[in-house]
């Protein structure tokens, strides 16, 4: 139960020391040093000796292997070592020393979603992209479950010749042509890369699981489970346990993945916002894009509050979470005849249809309101339906366990106001339904209106076709971007609510079956959807850069739900740019976007100079000596979106697009009206006569009249006979 609640929705970044570290006084530091000469850099043994030379004189030669836990080659010039504070001070005096930072511990942040995203077998984009055949997706996670049917290598090609990875399973577990690499990077653990938590198995199968018939949870959501890129290869790098994910281990895994030859990196984990030179995911991701490796990462699960994002660097695709159109419906039926639809994956056929006494202990006890462990013991809930509030730092499944332990017959889980109307189909331990905020308030009002409230739960099973999808989940972290306000984040949203995918064990306590699946939610689930889609795009367009692929995903994103109305948030209000980014991913459109915005490595360096970072700190990120002789502001980066702070003076920004659509084509600009801002684009028409031809345009922003909102949003779109290329705009008015 604990594993499910930890990984279904990740919580805040945590910092802690292990027991061993406390007892020895040593802590893990990530040490950055100057680059040695090329000869030393090219020889692994010489590089190790160079790193060892930075250790304090008090560290004897025999201690070195136990002190240095990771040596970095691609993502950083430096190493991770166990050191005391005094030893770090001694190292700071050495020539070539740059910095030493304490490791941070980060948190982990489909039978139907391929079809929901327009992917169908033997036709369309899936067929055109060859299902991602030959692309290698590297995932940094809790490990993987070899032998699960989702990781069968039926119809899989052999790994590409470039692959240099390792398989470190023990016993009878092995790699195959689907799982082509699996390694453990949790320092000091000595465990194989098998998955004890479930999170890594779930994300890996979401990204690239093979076709598995009759996948379901408790008989619900039944269908063929398959990942986004079913013919892509998987490489798992185990960096997380139930204690979290050390960024020193993450950096080591990124280092290895780059050397192994992955094509896509998928990171369903993150922490707080930091300057990029303190953010080891940003540092490792930059090393990856230097090699043409795409990096996709989850936005975080701290929504709907603003500025709660993780993974904000512009060279990372930052992914928020959306709903899809399938629900596993469980309806709360009240004694007054009112009914309120909710969700639950556990739907027992033998639950009686009779109404039972209904109670809400939270009226008099806050702990009991959240149904924390033991909080119901002083209440008479035996044989009753118990209302529990969502939140209170108590996992949803823990709440149902509390009700069961106290003798309750069923649970109605009610959202708080901040949660809005989004619900989850969890595998509860007793009959239950999860209802939205409005329904929860009506149910509590009914309880207060009568001395004998009663309720039951009517289980309706799996229903597909909810037209209000996609919508933004309440937990999905929101912008604005704190680390770089001039870059819109998240970049994109994708399915992350009630995602069915592979699981190491049966959640139904069944034995003798390997068809083990679970339904969980989080931006951790959205990220591998996008990682798999990126694998499809890499297969279809092997010459596209990471920035070009990101541009294609963003500029082709959907703005509407299945009803043709604007995408909504958890309050059923139109979602803003800080919730959706560019919009909801549309894989088929992304494969043929018409125009792309590309970015070169030098552009990123000028952008980092424009952030005002010290040259030494930029060098840590980009792994080369930097002289900031020229710089650009954030809004001048050739990004597929705009985020500006606009005062009284007009601001002008240029963008350059590359034609990847019809060779001969003409695009005309359309400007969505933005309150308080006049937007002018010149030229208003772009004409192309050949493929890969480039064109540059300028956008002018000017305040116009009074404004009531500090943040306003809009968009510019370039339209031809075949394409619409859209860039969202955020303006902060001052």
Curated annotation (Swiss-Prot):
Signal peptide per UniProt: 1-20
Enzyme active site: 141 (charge relay system), 199 (charge relay system), 524 (charge relay system)
PROSITE patterns tied to this protein: SUBTILASE (PS51892), SUBTILASE_ASP (PS00136)
Every Peptidase S8 domain range: 114-591
CDD domains hit by this protein: PA_subtilisin_like, Peptidases_S8_3
Induction: Regulated by RAM1 during arbuscular mycorrhiza (AM) formation after inoculation with Rhizophagus irregularis.
GO biological process: arbuscular mycorrhizal association; proteolysis; response to symbiotic fungus
Subcellular location: Secreted, Extracellular space, Apoplast
Keyword Hydrolase recorded: yes
The entry's keywords: Apoplast, Glycoprotein, Hydrolase, Protease, Secreted, Serine protease, Signal
Top-level taxonomic group: Eukaryota
Domain PA: start-end pairs: 357-442
Single annotated GO MF: serine-type endopeptidase activity
EC number(s) per entry: 3.4.21.-
Cellular component aspect of the GO annotation: apoplast; extracellular space
Family stated for the protein in its record: Belongs to the peptidase S8 family.
Role description: Required for arbuscular mycorrhiza (AM) development during AM symbiosis with AM fungi (e.g. Glomeromycota intraradices).
Protein name: Subtilisin-like protease
Organism: Petunia hybrida
């Amino acid at each position: 139960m604990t594993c499910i609640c930890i990984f279904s929705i990740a919580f805040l970044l945590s910092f802690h020391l292990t027991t061993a570290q406390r007892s020895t006084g040593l802590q893990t530091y990530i040490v950055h040093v100057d680059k040695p000469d090329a000869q030393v850099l090219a020889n692994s043994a010489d590089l190790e000796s160079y790193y060892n030379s930075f250790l304090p004189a008090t560290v004897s030669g025999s201690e070195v292997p136990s002190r240095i836990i990771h040596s970095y080659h691609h993502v950083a010039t430096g190493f991770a070592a166990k050191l005391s504070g005094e030893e770090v001070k001694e190292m700071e005096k050495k020539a070539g020393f740059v910095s030493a930072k304490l490791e941070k511990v980060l948190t982990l942040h489909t039978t139907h979603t391929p079809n929901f995203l327009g992917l169908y077998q033997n036709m369309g984009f899936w067929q055109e992209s060859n299902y991602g055949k030959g692309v290698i997706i590297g995932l940094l996670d809790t490990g993987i479950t070899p032998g699960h049917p989702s990781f069968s290598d039926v119809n899989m090609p052999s790994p590409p010749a470039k692959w240099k990875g390792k398989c470190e399973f023990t016993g009878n577990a092995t790699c195959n042509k689907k799982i082509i690499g699996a390694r453990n990077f949790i320092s000091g653990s000595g465990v194989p890369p098998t998955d004890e938590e479930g999170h890594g198995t779930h994300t890996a199968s979401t990204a690239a699981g093979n076709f598995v018939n009759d996948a379901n949870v408790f008989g619900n959501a039944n269908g063929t489970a398959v990942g986004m890129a079913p013919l892509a290869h998987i490489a798992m790098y185990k960096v997380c346990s139930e204690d979290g994910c050390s960024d020193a281990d993450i950096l080591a895994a990124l280092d290895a993945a780059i050397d192994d030859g992955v094509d896509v990196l998928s990171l369903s984990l993150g922490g707080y916002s930091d300057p990029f030179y303190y953010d080891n995911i940003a540092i490792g991701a930059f090393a990856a894009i230097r090699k043409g490796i795409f990096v996709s990462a989850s936005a975080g699960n701290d929504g709907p509050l603003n500025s709660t994002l993780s993974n904000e660097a512009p060279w990372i695709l930052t992914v928020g979470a959306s709903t899809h159109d399938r629900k596993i419906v469980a309806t709360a039926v009240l004694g007054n005849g009112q009914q309120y639809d909710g969700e639950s994956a556990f739907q027992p056929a033998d639950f009686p249809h009779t109404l039972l006494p209904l109670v809400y202990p939270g009226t008099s006890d806050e702990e009991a309101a959240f149904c924390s462990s033991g909080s119901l013991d002083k209440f008479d809930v035996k044989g009753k339906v118990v209302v529990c509030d969502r939140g209170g730092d108590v996992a949803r499944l823990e709440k149902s366990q509390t009700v069961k332990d106290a003798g309750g017959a069923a649970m109605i889980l009610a959202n708080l106001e901040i949660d809005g109307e989004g619900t989850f189909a969890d595998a509860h331990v007793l009959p239950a339904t999860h209802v939205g905020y409005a329904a929860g308030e009506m149910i509590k009002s009914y309880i207060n209106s009568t001395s004998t409230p009663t309720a039951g739960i009517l289980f309706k099973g799996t229903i597909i076709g909810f037209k209000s999808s996609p919508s933004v989940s309440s937990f999905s972290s929101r912008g604005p971007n704190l680390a770089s306000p001039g870059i819109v984040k998240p970049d994109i949203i994708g399915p992350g609510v009630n995602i069915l995918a592979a699981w190491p064990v049966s959640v139904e306590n069944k034995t003798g079956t390997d068809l083990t699946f679970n339904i969980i939610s989080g931006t951790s689930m959205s990220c591998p959807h996008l990682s798999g889609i990126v694998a499809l795009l890499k297969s279809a367009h092997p010459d596209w850069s990471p920035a070009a692929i990101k541009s294609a995903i963003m500029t082709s994103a959907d703005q509407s739900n299945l009803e043709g109305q604007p995408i909504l948030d958890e309050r059923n209000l139109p979602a803003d740019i800080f919730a959706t980014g560019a919009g909801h991913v549309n894989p088929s459109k992304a494969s043929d976007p018409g125009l792309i915005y590309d970015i070169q490595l030098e552009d990123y360096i000028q952008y980092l100079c424009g952030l005002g970072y010290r040259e030494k700190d930029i060098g840590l990120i980009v792994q080369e000596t930097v002289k900031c002789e020229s710089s650009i502001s954030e809004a001048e980066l050739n990004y597929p979106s705009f985020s500006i702070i606009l005062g009284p003076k007009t601001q002008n920004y240029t963008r350059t697009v590359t034609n990847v659509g019809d060779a001969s084509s003409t695009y005309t600009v359309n400007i969505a009206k933005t309150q308080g801002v006049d937007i002018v684009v010149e030229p208003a028409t772009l004409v192309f006569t050949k493929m890969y031809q480039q064109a540059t345009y300028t956008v002018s922003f000017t305040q116009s009249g009074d404004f009531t909102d500090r943040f306003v949003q809009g968009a510019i779109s370039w339209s031809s006979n075949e394409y619409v290329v859209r860039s969202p705009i955020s303006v902060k008015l001052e």
